[in-house]
């Protein structure tokens, strides 16, 4: 029997698909919405059949008919620049989709949030009537594994942002592309300070993307005869960066290039300023908060790499919307590439005004889990 529907025929429903496939409407619904309880082979068979039958959902009618979709948001670090940009991206996307009955419910967004408070927020979100949860965690991650039973028991989709939690049952993990970040920083350093000694400041080697950026930076500068004297871990604290820069000056006086691969670069630069030697260094940083852009305009920073946290927040919401509205299951891991911001670009930079039309496809790298094992 030819399953292709001719133009002008009555609208195809899930009942038509179920009858054609010889399965229940419940099975069709699960297959179309990416829910558990359907084998991969059967799911693909139903999706192909639906496509051949020109099945199309009435999105407007669905939006009117369905209940409100409640998305919980839990952020462990929301007071700092990178975290606040993620939260702002989430809020922007929720506002875009407010007419689609998509509503965000935020946990505590305080300046100083303890690990027990974050875990309690996450537990409360999972045990409540949330349909999905966006989680922006920081390490250590072991404590999150206890939530697998709740996630799997409720079949609730969880998307982690920026950091992947090993062994946690997640729908998707959206991360910065640490390897590309380090390579781009290395290329910039090779252009402005080739063959020199360098130092790298990151938050922690335990964060996969940050450690990857340091290692790929080292590999890239080596191509032009440069070397990496040391990697410093600031724990994302300016005060620690300030102290570690003193250590660098004492132990590695030959260093003339610095890559700060974490938001908090002010501590490093303030120490160099205190000795009035900041102009002797070529400095590459990350992110685009106001203090960084001011330093960029002043010529203290050579360039900064936007890790696009705002886009990460937006993408997390849009992926959940597509998951519920169209049954599209996102890849397990999505890497967001950085973009280079120079002094000329910094004069007009505003992350909230960046065009978001190509957000879901433009430049985003999707890798199978086997290619990015930690």
Predicted segment positions?
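Hydrophobic alpha-helical
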Residues: 132-152, 217, 233-293
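An alpha-beta-alpha
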Residues: 184-231, 320, 328, 332-347
């Amino acid at each position: 029997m030819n399953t292709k529907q001719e133009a002008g025929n009555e609208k195809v429903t899930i009942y038509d698909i179920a009858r054609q496939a010889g399965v229940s409407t419940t099975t069709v619904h699960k297959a179309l919405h990416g829910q558990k309880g359907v084998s991969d082979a059967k799911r693909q068979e139903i999706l192909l059949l639906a496509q051949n039958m020109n099945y199309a959902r009435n999105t407007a009618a669905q939006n009117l008919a369905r209940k409100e979709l409640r998305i919980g948001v839990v952020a462990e670090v929301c007071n700092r620049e990178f975290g606040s940009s993620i939260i702002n991206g989430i809020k922007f996307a929720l506002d875009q989709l407010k007419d689609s009955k998509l509503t965000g419910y935020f946990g505590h967004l305080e300046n100083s949030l303890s690990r027990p408070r974050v875990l309690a927020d996450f537990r409360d979100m999972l045990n409540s009537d949330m349909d999905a949860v966006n989680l922006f965690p920081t390490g250590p991650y072991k404590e999150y594994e206890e939530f697998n039973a709740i996630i799997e028991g409720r079949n609730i989709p969880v998307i982690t942002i920026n950091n992947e939690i090993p062994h946690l049952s997640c729908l998707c993990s959206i991360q910065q592309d640490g390897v590309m970040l380090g390579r781009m920083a290395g290329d910039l350093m090779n252009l402005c300070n080739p063959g020199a000694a360098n130092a790298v400041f990151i938050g922690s080697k335990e964060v996969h993307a940050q450690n990857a950026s340091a290692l790929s930076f080292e590999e890239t500068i080596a191509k032009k005869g440069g070397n990496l004297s040391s990697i410093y871990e600031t724990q994302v604290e300016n005060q620690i960066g300030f102290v570690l820069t003193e250590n660098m000056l004492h132990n590695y006086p030959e260093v003339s290039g610095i890559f700060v691969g974490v938001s908090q670069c002010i501590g490093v630069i303030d120490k160099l300023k205190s000795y009035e030697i900041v102009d002797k260094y070529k400095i590459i940083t990350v992110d685009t908060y106001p203090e960084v852009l001011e330093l960029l305009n002043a010529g203290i920073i050579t360039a900064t790499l936007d890790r696009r946290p705002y886009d990460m927040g937006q993408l997390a919401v849009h992926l959940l919307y597509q998951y519920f509205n169209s049954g599209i299951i996102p890849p397990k891991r999505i890497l967001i590439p950085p973009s280079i911001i120079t002094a000329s670009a910094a004069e007009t930079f505003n992350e909230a005004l960046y065009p978001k039309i190509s957000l879901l496809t433009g430049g985003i790298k999707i890798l199978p889990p086997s290619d990015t094992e930690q």
